[in-house]
């Protein structure tokens, strides 16, 4: 909308709007926002001192983590869908050009891929939350992640940094210096390591 107001003679296309919005979500907004939700979900029992009581019920620690991950997935994908719908509505209100079923499907696909991959990458954020049992370190950690993602954006190194690799994968903008497999491996390795660290730490930690 701002671009259209500044350059009224330059048409704004839906494809660019979907792509730019998803870029902002993946690199700038998504990680801190989902980090806050993650921190709340996994730190709430610590903050309210109810985790020990919760674990007295026949619920394993792994089951507790899985249930919270399912809830987190629902939150992330729901917010991603809302962002896609709002982008479409703003485009219709602003009378952007180039709307077609192909553009809608491609935009929806990019949003969903970005949301799903960001969900996978919350595992290190969960570990930081459990480690410090406080919201502040988690928020700082996610802000640092976003800053690094923005710093490497547009360079070939964005294909290697897990959180910026999400955008590379979702948009299909791979770099000739690094095959697509590098981006997938970066995301997968970070996810697995973060999840493993979370499970091992949560199983061994003493609950007071």
Swiss-Prot record:
Any Pfam family matching the protein: ABC2_membrane_4
One GO CC annotation: plasma membrane
Transmembrane portions of the chain: 23-43, 70-90, 111-131, 135-155, 159-179, 182-202
Record keywords, A-Z: Antibiotic resistance, Cell membrane, Membrane, Transmembrane, Transmembrane helix, Transport
Membrane topology term: Multi-pass membrane protein
The protein's role, per its UniProt record: Part of the binding-protein-dependent transport system for bacitracin that confer resistance to this antibiotic; probably responsible for the translocation of the substrate across the membrane.
Protein name (Swiss-Prot/TrEMBL): Bacitracin transport permease protein BCRB
Species classification: Bacteria, Bacillati, Bacillota, Bacilli, Bacillales
């Amino acid at each position: 909308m701002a671009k259209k107001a500044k350059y009224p003679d330059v048409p704004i296309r839906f494809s660019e709007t979907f792509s730019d919005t998803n870029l902002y979500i993946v690199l700038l907004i998504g990680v801190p926002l989902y980090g806050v939700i993650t921190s709340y979900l996994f730190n709430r029992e610590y903050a309210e001192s109810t985790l020990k009581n919760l674990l007295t019920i026949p619920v394993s620690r792994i089951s507790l983590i899985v249930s919270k991950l399912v809830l987190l997935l629902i939150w992330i994908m729901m917010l991603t869908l809302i962002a896609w719908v709002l982008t479409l509505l703003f485009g219709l209100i602003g009378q952007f050009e180039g709307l077609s079923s192909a553009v809608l499907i491609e935009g929806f696909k990019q949003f969903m891929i970005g949301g799903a991959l960001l969900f996978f990458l919350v595992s290190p954020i969960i570990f930081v939350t459990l480690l410090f049992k406080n919201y502040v370190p988690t928020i700082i950690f996610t802000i640092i992640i976003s800053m690094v993602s923005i710093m490497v954006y547009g360079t070939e190194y964005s294909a290697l940094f897990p959180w910026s690799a999400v955008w590379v994968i979702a948009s299909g903008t791979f770099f000739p210096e690094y095959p697509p497999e590098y981006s997938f491996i970066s995301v997968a390795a970070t996810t697995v390591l973060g999840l493993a660290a979370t499970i091992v730490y949560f199983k061994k930690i003493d609950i007071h």
